[in-house]
């Protein structure tokens, strides 16, 4: 606890995503020794410029006390960079976090196979379904799933792991006590029963745009391999891949091949350029580590059904708990979303569909549009996550 106080002070003065915390662990017996050395010692270390030394001089040590009090009040755990419990795989990167704030219990990440499942927040239904199923299957094989707790691919991979009664780590780009994406609050709570929600930022820290690239280095460091589910050419997932390869050039990168369209430009390019290994099945990932980890045999009879997509949260709707999973009471959700920026034909097709399956011939009858015009519109609505195909050529709202 004593070291914690000094490490929190250090982060408040110097910030996050810095190489200097790790360097201090080699130069001093403790962070307390460094602090007590004062300005003269800080200069002698050769690590800090005048502006940083001035800031350390002005930041009082008791700035840490409120943060520690918050952790005690909400039963959050903390692990400092110089603690024996600090993950070795995280310490090994150039800029490991000085402090990790933890809700739940951090799994033994160094001795258990872990895969980061990443992708776009605006995932297609193919991406949502694939991330859920891959996380489910990998979890059944004993793999820890790591992701970022965002909407889309992150959320569905966490939920797939929970459905498999597996272990998952959610790495946030804000404080673990901040009400980030309220609709995912129940999911984050469920994660803590067998895994952990973690952050390098103090509990009440608001998310900033630059936090997420910083967060990505933690996701990549904690994982043995990275699975890219769906990424466009400018996706943040590519930042995670780059971070992983900068940390360890031999890090295994996997990607799910997708349609030849903008949603999968980044994923397909990783495969084309041989940065990532193409995967079509969870076993492709397991086999890549067969000389490193022993995994459990997957119970094939326990495969998730197509209905799993119904439990993926919708932005802005508070979650409920149904059979241990997170879903939404669709009876309370307006049948059709507003302000979707659809063309007139797209609106006609969208409003012809409801929560009961509607055949494409019926849609044609309602809209007075020929089927050949409806088909590309259907594809657009599916990619935007507004509808899904449920049987044959029938569709329903999501």
Question: For each of these PLM feature ranges, what is it?
Answer:
Residues 3, 80-398:
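Glycine-biased, small-residue-rich flexible motifs in mid-sequence functional cores and linkers
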Residues 1-129, 133-140:
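Short, positively charged patches
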